[in-house]
A protein has these predicted regions:
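Catalytic P-loop NTPase motifs of RecA-like helicase/translocase cores
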Residues: 12, 70, 91-92, 116-117, ...
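Walker A/P-loop NTP-binding motif
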Residues: 14-29, 50-53
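Alpha-helical scaffold elements adjacent to nucleotide-binding pockets in ATP/GTP-utilizing enzyme cores
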Residues: 20, 46-50, 90, 124, ...
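Short, small-residue-biased leader/transition segments that mark boundaries at the very start
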Residues: 3-8
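Conserved interdomain hinge at the start of the Helicase C-terminal
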Residues: 171-173
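Conserved phosphate-coupling serine/threonine residues in phosphotransfer and NTP-handling enzymes
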Residues: 9-11, 40, 87, 142
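Conserved nucleic-acid-binding Ia/Ib motif block in the N-terminal RecA-like helicase ATPase lobe
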Residues: 30-96, 104-107
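Post-DEXD/H (motif II) to motif III coupling segment of the RecA-like Helicase ATP-binding lobe
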Residues: 101-167
Length: 173
């Protein structure tokens, strides 16, 4: 089975990365296996909602500013989520406090990468990546073709997937 690095663009992407993600989760692990970074609380909650609507038994934890970090820590330590969804600033806080083991994370997804850069999360995302020694797969999702994608991640043969044709392509048809 050949693994590829990819960059997904445009809309309709949440299920496109959540469904295959289920195949990578180890059932008897009990540790955080996947980290999904997002630029906003709203997107974190939306992704969590989509994941819960899928009806899996996997647990998630949303971590974002404006929410009590003590409650998030309690959820992480008590519920043993396989997936943590959060903003870069809050994830950095949890890592600095040792609230979860970053060594068990094998997949990193950065959703709305372009927005995360726009909101100034470059340094936090770069720092988080350095703390994930077991990382095997990275996925960046972006509505725009940000120049920083290959340079930021070290991805060298990205696969770009467009879920909807550009307006110019529609007019040509």
């Amino acid at each position: 089975r050949r693994q590829r690095q990819m960059c997904i663009r445009d809309r309709g992407k949440t299920l496109a990365y959540l469904l295959p993600l289920l195949l990578t989760l180890k059932t008897d692990d009990g540790s955080v296996q996947v980290l999904i970074l997002v630029p906003s609380r709203e997107l974190a909650l939306q992704i969590d909602s989509v994941f819960k609507a899928m009806g899996t038994s996997w647990k998630t934890c949303c971590c974002y500013g404006g929410h009590p970090i003590a409650e998030e820590k309690k959820s992480i330590l008590g519920n043993h989520p396989a997936i943590i969804i959060g903003t870069p600033g809050r994830i950095t806080d949890h890592l600095s406090k040792g609230n979860f083991n970053p060594e068990t994370i094998h997949t990193l997804i950065i959703d709305e990468f372009d927005k995360s850069l726009e909101f100034g999360f470059h340094d936090e995302m770069a720092e988080i990546i350095t703390q994930l020694p077991g990382l095997k797969k990275r996925m960046l999702l972006s509505a725009t073709d940000a120049e920083e994608i290959p340079q930021f991640t070290g991805l060298n043969r990205t696969v770009k997937l467009n879920f909807l044709p550009d307006a110019s392509e529609e007019q040509e048809s």
